[in-house]
Amino acid sequence: TTTVQVFEETTGLKPGETVTASGDALSVTLGPGILNNIFDGIERPLSEIAKQSGKYISRGLTVDSLDTEKKWDVHVTVSEGEELMGGAIIAETQETRSIVHKSMVPPDVNGTVIWAAKDGKYTILDPIVKLKLEDGTEKEITLAQKWPIRVPRPTLKRYPASVPLITGQRILDT
């Protein structure tokens, strides 16, 4: 028995249909540009979808969550020879006037920097750092990461809230 969670129209789907797994858990892309967008529940950028298909989402429309062609001003914060572990900040990007996006090494990656890009303009898919991992392999790190939505981001310490975040917005979900 298999349970399927769907996010689109299911007309034509019936028991016994062949299912092809993607091999990946439902994931989001984390990187520069995430704060300048409005997404639906599965990280589809609604403004880009509206540009391509109008007010209604066309069947089969595929849009990248984050703009893969936009070049961001990137300040690289690491240099060759540094030992990095998961969560280390490798680059900073001014995403909005008040928010600096910090790109990090994925949590499960540790290694030595063997190459680092110079400060400049890069897309979220351009390599920013190349690490030599403990097993001798090399891994390129970009400004963006895919992250499974059901896996919490690891933290060293959780700080309790001392002051409530008051936004002035009232949200009802019934």
Each language-model region and where it sits:
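A structural micro-motif recognizing beta-strand termini
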Residues: 5-10, 23-24, 41-42, 67-80, ...
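N-terminal accessory targeting/assembly segments
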Residues: 1-50, 55-58
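A generic structural motif
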Residues: 1, 25, 98, 108-110
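Conserved hydrophobic positions within beta-strands
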Residues: 1, 38, 89, 113-117
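Short coil-to-beta-strand transition motifs
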Residues: 29-34, 103-110
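P-loop NTPase nucleotide-binding/switch module
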Residues: 49-107, 123-174
